[in-house]
Amino acid sequence: MTLIFNDIALLKDLKAKTIKCFFILHICLFYSASSFADNSKLNLLSLPAGFEISIFAENISTPRQITEGSEYIFTASGSKGQIYALSDSNSDFVIDNNRIIANDLFDSRGVTYKDGDLYFAEVNKIWVIRDVENWLNDNNEGMPEKELITDNLPSNPWHGWKWIKFGPDNKLYVPVGAPCNVCLEELEDDSRFASIMRLNDGNWEHVARGVRNSIGFDWHPVTQELYFADNGRDWLGDDSPS
């Protein structure tokens, strides 16, 4: 797969006239690397004035959420059940080292980095690799040890993938999707479904309910209000929002 620059944050070095941002174009996640092997195809994309787009990383299977460390960028592959550590050692905006640091995971989608540690999620579990960048810089062989944070999450795979992130309160926020397209009974059986939750001292608490399938959220930098995207019901047709 081909990874295209995402919108997480502006790059620190803005010497060039063109603003470069880390920007993942969701549509590109479903194309093979060969689809963008010819850079001329990138010209088919419409960009705002003053922006450029270029291939940032290749040969990553279905990359999903991205998180930035101090020296590395981390992403997850749901289809392969893997976590990747990416590095751009010469700062040319092209990844030159791509390493798998966890595998054999159950539909891993979510990753987040905090205080030197990398957290990542399966459908029903959340793990952490402590001091991950120092481990990578020490050129260790194999894979780093991962520590289980929780396995107390529903294991239903329908909308079971987890996007994760720490909030301004330093608590870990995790959406739990509805295990269906449209349903009520399943939600009554387990109140965690169709919600956004946060981990507070080892216990889960609800932040929002009635959230069918959130695959992205963040906080307002000033008010600290939580904003999230929610995927609505499927199969309404081309003329109705979903």
Segments predicted by a language model, with ranges:
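Cleavable N-terminal signal peptides
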Residues: I24-L25, S35
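N-terminal secretory signal peptides that target proteins for export/translocation
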Residues: M1-K17
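Beta-propeller domains with acidic blade repeats across secreted/periplasmic ectodomains
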Residues: A37-S242
